[in-house]
Amino acid sequence: SFVPPIKGYDLRGVFTLRTIEDAHEISTYANNTDNVVLIGGGLLGIETGYALRKSGKKVTVVESFPRLLPRQLDVDGAFRLQQILEEMGFHFRLSAKTLEIIGDNQTTTGVILEGGEVL
């Protein structure tokens, strides 16, 4: 999968999801955190977020497009999906750009969005 050139992408606690091994690493790491930020509102991210929500994690999805699944859903379908996911406890930052992943001692502590919001 595409990894955008974001400062801090190499910190501990930042993952890509390409293989089943990646999924296992994410699951193992998630046991030690309560908050998860998913960069990208695509199908794999949403599915991963769903699994993490079921395990009690706070999940925030950062998507650069103004809606989820822009290649798969029209505006109405994306809005309905977002409503359903929000009812499940998801949080969204749409039309948002990730500027930097921040951390201390090489471990992720947050994500800075364009505009200055820190997740």
Task: List each model region and its residues.
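Short glycine-/acidic-enriched loop or helix-start segments at secondary-structure transitions
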Residues: V3-I6, T48-G49, R71, G103
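Short beta->alpha linker loops
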Residues: R18-E21, L43, A96
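Rossmann-like NAD(P)H-binding beta-loop-alpha module
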Residues: E25-L73, T108
